């Protein structure tokens, strides 16, 4: 088991280029192609995705709009951030305001921010 852990640690330390090179060497050594396996598994995974309904949303502030001060006030009320942090979030848009919220709460937050003049996206 210690040997397996060492292999995992070694693989984890590879750069992306080194990992790609390793994949190519293993394909040549074993006479297989990773692309073929991905092509076969890809459509099945894509077909299963629409069946799942999204339950957690991220409310993203896309743009502050014209009433930046009002948006900052709403961001502070929603997140509990201090004035400087809320201002930085608003000025750094697009940025997530709240993550991992249910659909109802996400819609409520979106409505609050849009009422203040912001452009908001749910992801």
UniProtKB/Swiss-Prot annotation:
Molecular-function annotations in GO: mRNA binding; structural constituent of ribosome
One Gene Ontology term, aspect cellular component: cytosolic large ribosomal subunit
Keyword match S-adenosyl-L-methionine: no
Keyword annotations: Ribonucleoprotein, Ribosomal protein
Family named by the database record: Belongs to the bacterial ribosomal protein bL12 family.
Role: Forms part of the ribosomal stalk which helps the ribosome interact with GTP-bound translation factors. Is thus essential for accurate translation.
Subunit structure: Homodimer. Part of the ribosomal stalk of the 50S ribosomal subunit. Forms a multimeric L10(L12)X complex, where L10 forms an elongated spine to which 2 to 4 L12 dimers bind in a sequential fashion. Binds GTP-bound translation factors.
Protein name per UniProt: Large ribosomal subunit protein bL12
Native species: Rhodopseudomonas palustris (strain BisB18)
